[in-house]
Structure formats: structure tokens, C-alpha cells
A protein has these predicted regions:
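A hydrophobic/aromatic-rich effector-binding and dimerization subdomain
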Residues: 1-10, 58-129, 148-157
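Short beta-strand/loop turn elements enriched in aromatics
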Residues: 10-22
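Histidine-centered metal-chelating micro-motifs
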Residues: 15-16, 35, 51, 55-64, ...
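Short, conserved beta-strand element in jelly-roll/cupin
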Residues: 19-36, 52
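A generic fold-level signal
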Residues: 19-21, 45, 67-69, 166
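Short acidic-glycine-tyrosine-enriched beta hairpin
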Residues: 40-55
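Short, Lys/Arg-enriched, Trp-marked, Pro/Gly-tolerant hinge/linker segments that flank
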Residues: 99-113, 127-195
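Key DNA-contact positions within bacterial/archaeal DNA-binding proteins
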Residues: 200
Length: 201
């Protein structure tokens, strides 16, 4: 199989091991809350989160059983499937590997999350619709859209993290500059010229 889609519903306290094997593993949290303990990081398995494991990665899902059930849809995609879904402008596997993580939890914005949720639910029932008109093309389109949205969620999260990091770095640089020039008169004009920012910032 080049891809699988499976729903997990946990209603009692649970600890379960997952391993991606040769697949790109995407876990979309539909409701509830738990944690994913991986070798390098603890990831929040909370509603609206998308957890991604690259091939060869594992994690232990821990659900305490409180505050309602935990529902997750797991979509596994092989490199071959990503190649089939790619086009001349977009290499999906390469795009996944540009993002600097082996295990990550991202929080898509509400619009992307709602689309991912609907697509994930559709992936669960596609095997029962294989006799319908255009089933193969429809399946290809659903999978392609799911992967694009998952990657967009990663890119948005990475951009936000980079922006926040850059903002903190800029503030650190400003404070260090002020500290080094405490005995001098520092005007906003001078700070503007030193750091190429507007005084409004």
C-alpha cells in the first residue's frame, strides 16, 4: 500500500507506541488531548494539532483518559505515493525534507484545519467508494490536497517561529548596542540608522 488512513478513538487511559517505518506519518487530532513522547521531544496531541513523523521515527502516545475521548486520524504516505502526487513544479517529499524536523506538532490555522479534517474523514471512506465514477482521479485529488495543506501548515508554523526568533534577536541586538553606548546620547534617528528599522517599531 502506498498510503493508509485509519481512525483511532481512545476513551480510557491509554499508552500506545507508533512507528512510521518507511512512511511519512501524519496524525490529525480531531478532539481530545494527550501527549506524544518521541526520542527528542514531547509533542502536544491536542485538538487542531497536526503531528508529523518522518520515516524511521517513533513515538509513544499517552492519553490520561480525562476530559473526554481522544480521536486521531492517522494518514501514512510512502515516498512513492508522494512522488505520484507531485508535479513538475512541486516535489512533495523534498518539501517535507526541507522542514527541519524529524518529529513535529504544528497547529494549522482554523481554515486549513477544517479542510484537513474534512479531507481526512473522506480518506477513511474512499475504499468503499472505489466503484464510483472517477474514483481514482478523486482519490488522487483528495490526497494531493491533504498533502499540500499539511505542508502549508508546516511552512506557516516555520515562518511564525522564524519571525518570533528574529524579533527576539533584534531586541537583543538593540539592548546590547544601548548597553555599549550608555555614556553617549542615543537618539531614535541613530537607532533607525543602526538597525534599519522605523522608530515606530
Amino acid at each position: 500500500m502506498n498510503y493508509t488512513a485509519k481512525r483511532y478513538l481512545f476513551e480510557q487511559s491509554t499508552v500506545r507506541e507508533f512507528f512510521s517505518g518507511a512512511y511519512y506519518d501524519l496524525f490529525l487530532v480531531m478532539r481530545g488531548s494527550g501527549v506524544f513522547r518521541c526520542s527528542e521531544v514531547v509533542l502536544p496531541a491536542q485538538q487542531q494539532n497536526l503531528i508529523i513523523l518522518k520515516p524511521g521515527q517513533g513515538g509513544r502516545l499517552e492519553y490520561a483518559g480525562a476530559y473526554g475521548p481522544l480521536e486521531i486520524i492517522r494518514v501514512q504516505l510512502s515516498p512513492q505515493m508522494l512522488a505520484q502526487l507531485s508535479d513538475e513544479d512541486t516535489d512533495f517529499e523534498k518539501s517535507f525534507n526541507v522542514v527541519p524536523f524529524r518529529q513535529v506538532a504544528v497547529r494549522p490555522d482554523s481554515q486549513i484545519y477544517m479542510l484537513l479534517k474534512n479531507l481526512a474523514r473522506k480518506l477513511l471512506v474512499l475504499p468503499q467508494e472505489s466503484s464510483q465514477f472517477g474514483a481514482a482521479a478523486f482519490e488522487h485529488g483528495i490526497l494531493q490536497m491533504f498533502v499540500v495543506l499539511a505542508l502549508r501548515a508546516c511552512i506557516h508554523a516555520e515562518f511564525h517561529t522564524a519571525s518570533v526568533s528574529r524579533h527576539h534577536l533584534m531586541l537583543d541586538e538593540v539592548f546590547l548596542f544601548i548597553q555599549a553606548h550608555l555614556t553617549e546620547e542615543l537618539t531614535l534617528d541613530r537607532l533607525e540608522k543602526e538597525f534599519f528599522v522605523s522608530r515606530e517599531h
